[in-house]
Amino acid sequence: MKDRGMTNTPLSSSELVNTMSHFHRAEIGRMAGWRDRLDRTTNWAITVAAAMLSISLSTPTSHHGVLLFAMLLILLLLWIEARRYRFFDVYRTRVRQFERYYFAQIFSPQSDFAADWLLIFGESLRAPKFLMSQWAAFTRRLRRNYIYMFLILLLAWVLKITTPSLQAEGAERNFVNSLREAVANASLGPLPGWLIVTSLVLFYLVLTGAAFLTRSKDGELGYGEVHV
């Protein structure tokens, strides 16, 4: 006797409804799992930023390089979160396809509204693929969360190099009187201050461009104002 699982026998209406409901529930679970991973990565980044801010600003003996190191750690966590976001986006898209093409059609039917969506959905199950690049995921997470952490770290770094009371003992207890003094305070070991400042300016220009100049209406923002 042939295995029923290998035949092309169509499902009855009740079997189809059960299959759709169970599969939708399963995809919500997978989406929620990856959403939790995203939140945990963001929480790690916030914790790292808060810890480094506390270390750097709590004592004059702490070097401003601590904040530069914090920026590198946040960048690493952002890259990890972008990778996780690509997985999350796959399952989020499947859930939204169910909502947009199946449930929405039940509640508010429209004629010939993506009638072949199940065929496209089936092919995506046979050969799952990422729906966005690593760079696109990177810029999206940067724009929504991480740009604010980088901004806070930058403001703290500027405060650190321009306020002698937050630097090592021996410095005068007043704000720097010129840009040259601030640049000199930004030196890091054998690296001169101008090199550190220039590198940081370029780094933040790239971040700003990635966050706001690469913005597009692709994804859920193309269908409404609500996104995850």
Model-derived features with residue positions:
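Cytosolic-side membrane-entry/anchor segment at the start of a transmembrane helix
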Residues: 7-58, 190-194
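Transmembrane helix interruption/hinge and helix-loop junction motifs
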Residues: 57-65
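Solvent-exposed, non-transmembrane helices and loops of integral membrane proteins
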Residues: 5-16, 96-133, 222-227
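Cytosolic/matrix-facing juxtamembrane and C-terminal tails of multi-pass cellular membrane proteins
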Residues: 185-188, 203-228
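Loop-to-transmembrane boundary segments
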Residues: 29-39, 116-155, 189-194
